[in-house]
């Protein structure tokens, strides 16, 4: 299939940069315009878009359309890609998550997780980066539709506690989506910008950002003064969020169902489990504003209806360990920043899960009764801050962003392995970035010809307990007794939090370096190129499928329009019975063919429409020649866009608005109706 470019060819190129909050469960996009941030709604009018991608026998769906059909197609609807990105298949968090996912995750090359789905009748494997790139592409398209321009540049946010490989993988996802990722920034830092942008000139303020989303949790402590945002410390858990609370509620309901129905276990039925999860998520949201919520699902499993009422107290009891755990990183950042809780001027809540009353209560109690700030929208704050940072990086001249300076930190210590497997740290965690640090190392044995530089991140004393980022050899060291050669190792971490390591042997000047592109989560340039091409191919397929559906709808509209006219008494009187029979026979045959050929090609539908028109158009045009264009038109109207007849008639057999029966119906679809191909989406209703 011909490759289709990711952005619409008729859109003018733009140097506008957008900010994208790529979330575990929902994503959000914003743009800086007219001294403010516009959060951009999607084609459904929602300001956040589910981070869901679904594959069917005919098409690929992204966002709301994917989430709406999840109960019918759980095995091929992928979500939570952010919980896989940059991780290994064997990690305990991945293994535990897999128990809750209806889709299949397999181990690929170098233990990279691969998501298996069935798409257009074939089994396909996708990297988590590819799924995330599809969500990013959707956000890019939303922005392009809103701005009427092609977008290339973006700032994407990640949890502050994402490690190097997770950051790299997120950057790769942006590249696959056809974006130039100008910067990866930390979510709590972006939220701090949203909070502090219009609060200048009020002296130094210490702000604690508490960001609890759908899948990740971050706490950052910042000092804001005169437009300078300086991160003092950050902590968190890249695997804690609303999804975990949903899981607890789902497990409770599975056990409750088992108890009420003689041990029947619905946990092996992915459709039942998905329907239950959807209702549990709704109940969780309800419990943020009500003290109880009822979960009711008809015919949940083996024809059995299920109903249970969950109180807020019961929900809190189910998740209390998770809720309490959120205070551990709060204590950690205060300790790291050497600050007392009384010194925190403002606690800012970000992320949908901070709406849970118990979490708000725990934070209030921890800060001795201090009310948390709720002046920013918890769902949109991160995208808002990312959009501001995008404006700064694209050189926006407006006063509001010109004086703003962001000083972020690296969230994990970086170092290398020295004799005995010891972790020697070069850059301590919470060091302001960008940062550069050098240290001299030497050889361990006489006449050692080379050294192996192994780079790690983490806080443990021994490297075996930390995360290996990458390694390289420096060879060609001249023979010398141990401890004589001098090897200078430099760690250079850029503003994206991505690391370069260089080693130089001082006497010869021989050097080697590595940009940490870590096998653990990083794709090779060849893989990225392939995925970029695949993304364009899928995009082209989506466009092709849209045109196919439009052609089908056009044919269907035409047939039912003619059928309804022929059944009208006033029109019947103007035609011979043989003419009515000829038309009806042709239309009935085509409608029967349509019923059996829902997946026919665009060309087949168009050919069938021409066939119908060649039979019906001459006969239908007679009616209007008889009336000579009298008002009233087609009584009863035609489904899909001609309610109440067509005032003004149709002189000469033509219909206004591109509906000329003798010449066919160009463009598919009828004026006044829903655009062809965008018919109502069917949502699951329990």
From Swiss-Prot:
Family, according to the entry, reads as follows: Belongs to the heat shock protein 70 family.
Which residue ranges are recorded for the region named Disordered?
Answer: 657-686
Protein name, as recorded: Heat shock 70 kDa protein
Name the segments for region: 10 X 4 AA tandem repeats of G-G-M-P. 632-675
Q: Where is the composition biased (Gly residues)?
A: 657-676
Keyword Repeat assigned: yes
Question: Known PANTHER family for this protein?
Answer: HEAT SHOCK PROTEIN 70KDA (PTHR19375)
The UniProt GO MF terms for this protein read:
ATP binding; ATP-dependent protein folding chaperone
Arranged from A to Z, the UniProt key words for this protein are: ATP-binding, Nucleotide-binding, Repeat, Stress response
Q: Would I find ATP-binding among this entry's keywords? A: yes
Where would I find the sequence repeats?
A: 632-635, 636-639, 640-643, 644-647, 648-651, 653-656, 657-660, 663-666, 668-671, 672-675
Q: Which domain of life is it from?
A: Eukaryota
């Amino acid at each position: 299939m011909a490759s289709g470019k990711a952005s619409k060819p008729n859109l003018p190129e733009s140097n506008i940069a957008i900010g994208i909050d790529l979330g575990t469960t929902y994503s959000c996009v914003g743009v800086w315009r007219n001294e403010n941030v516009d959060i951009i709604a999607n084609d459904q009018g929602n300001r956040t878009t589910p981070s869901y991608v679904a594959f069917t026998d005919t098409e690929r769906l992204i966002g709301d359309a994917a989430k709406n059909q999840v109960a019918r197609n759980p095995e091929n609807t992928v979500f939570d890609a952010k919980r896989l990105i940059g991780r290994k298949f064997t990690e305990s968090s991945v293994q535990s998550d897999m128990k809750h996912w209806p889709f299949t995750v397999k181990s690929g090359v170098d233990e990279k997780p691969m998501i298996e789905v069935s798409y257009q009748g074939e089994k396909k494997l996708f990297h988590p980066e590819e799924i995330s790139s599809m969500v990013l592409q959707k956000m890019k398209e939303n922005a392009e539709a809103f701005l009427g321009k092609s977008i290339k540049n973006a700032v994407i946010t990640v949890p502050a506690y994402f490690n190097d490989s997770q950051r790299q993988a997120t950057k790769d996802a942006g590249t696959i989506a056809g974006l130039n990722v100008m910067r990866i920034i930390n979510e709590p830092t972006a939220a701090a910008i949203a909070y502090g942008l219009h609060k200048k000139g009020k002296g130094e303020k210490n702000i604690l950002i508490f960001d609890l989303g759908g899948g990740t949790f971050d706490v950052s402590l910042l000092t804001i003064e005169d437009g300078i945002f300086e991160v003092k410390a950050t902590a968190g858990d890249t695997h804690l969020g609303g999804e975990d609370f949903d899981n607890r509620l789902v497990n409770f309901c599975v056990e409750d169902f088992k108890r009420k129905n003689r041990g029947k276990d619905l946990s092996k039925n992915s459709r039942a489990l998905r329907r239950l999860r959807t209702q549990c998520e709704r109940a969780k949201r309800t419990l943020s504003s009500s003290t109880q919520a009822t979960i009711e699902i008809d015919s949940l499993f083996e024809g059995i209806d299920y109903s249970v009422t969950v109180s807020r107290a019961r929900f809190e009891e189910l998740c209390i360990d998770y809720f309490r755990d959120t205070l551990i990183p709060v204590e950690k950042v205060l300790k790291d920043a050497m600050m007392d809780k009384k010194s925190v001027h403002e606690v800012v809540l970000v992320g949908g899960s901070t709406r849970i009353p118990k979490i708000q209560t725990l934070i209030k109690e921890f800060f001795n009764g201090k009310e948390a700030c709720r002046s920013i929208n918890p769902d949109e704050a991160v995208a808002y801050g990312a959009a501001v940072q995008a404006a700064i990086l694209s050189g926006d001249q407006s006063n509001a962003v010109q004086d703003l300076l962001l000083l972020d930190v690296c969230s994990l210590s970086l170092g290398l392995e020295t004799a005995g497997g010891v972790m020697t740290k070069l850059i301590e965690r919470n060091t302001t970035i960008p940062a550069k640090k050098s240290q001299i190392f030497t050889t361990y044995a006489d006449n050692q010809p080379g050294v192996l530089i192994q780079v790690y991140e983490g806080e443990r004393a021994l490297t075996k307990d930390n995360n290996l980022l990458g390694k390289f050899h420096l060879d060609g060291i001249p023979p010398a007794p141990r401890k004589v050669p001098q090897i200078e190792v430099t760690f250079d971490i850029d503003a994206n939090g991505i690391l370069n390591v260089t080693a130089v042997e001082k006497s010869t000047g021989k050097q080697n370096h590595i940009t940490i592109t870590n096998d653990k989560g990083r794709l090779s340039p060849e893989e990225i190129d392939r995925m970029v091409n695949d993304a364009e191919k899928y995009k082209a397929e989506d466009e092709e499928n849209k045109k196919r559906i439009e052609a089908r709808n056009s044919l269907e509209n035409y047939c039912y329009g003619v059928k309804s006219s022929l059944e009208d008494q006033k029109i019947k009187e103007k035609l011979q019975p043989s003419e009515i029979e000829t038309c009806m026979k042709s239309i009935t045959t085509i409608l029967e063919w349509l019923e059996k050929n829902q997946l026919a090609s665009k060309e087949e539908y168009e050919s069938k429409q021409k066939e119908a028109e060649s039979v019906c158009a001459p006969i239908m045009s007679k009616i209007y020649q008889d009336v000579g264009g009298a008002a009233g038109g087609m009584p009863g109207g035609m489904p899909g866009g001609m309610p109440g007849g067509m005032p003004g008639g149709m002189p000469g057999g033509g219909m206004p608005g591109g509906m000329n029966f003798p010449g066919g119906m160009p463009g598919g679809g009828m004026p006044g109706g829903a655009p062809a191909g965008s018919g109502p989406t069917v949502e699951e209703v329990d």
